[in-house]
Amino acid sequence: MAGFWSKIFGNDEKPSSAQTAKDRLKVIVASEQGLGRRLSQDKIDQMKKEIMQVVSRYVRGVDEDHIQMQVRSEANIEMLEMNINLPEER
């Protein structure tokens, strides 16, 4: 698990494939239970704010505009897709 976090937030090694992918973190939560019916836009907005607060503890310069969340369907499975564009390291 430590390797996962070091890939996301960096370490002293050469740039990883995550760096090559422009420091983009993508998380997908999939469900056959119908996420769209259970997650209102208000709940998605609240999740976005809470996730931003957690990411901001570890990465400077992340704001709400860097986080995109959407519910989409694919092959009878609804997914909550979240993209976080991390700012360039300075």
From Swiss-Prot:
Region Disordered, residue ranges: 1-21
GO biological process, one term: regulation of division septum assembly
Domain of life of the organism encoding this protein: Bacteria
Keyword Cell division recorded: yes
Pfam families the record matches: MinE
InterPro entries the UniProt entry points to: MinE, MinE_sf
Biased composition (Basic and acidic residues): 10-21
Family listed: Belongs to the MinE family.
Function: Prevents the cell division inhibition by proteins MinC and MinD at internal division sites while permitting inhibition at polar sites. This ensures cell division at the proper site by restricting the formation of a division septum at the midpoint of the long axis of the cell.
Descriptive protein name: Cell division topological specificity factor
Organism of this sequence: Acinetobacter baylyi (strain ATCC 33305 / BD413 / ADP1)
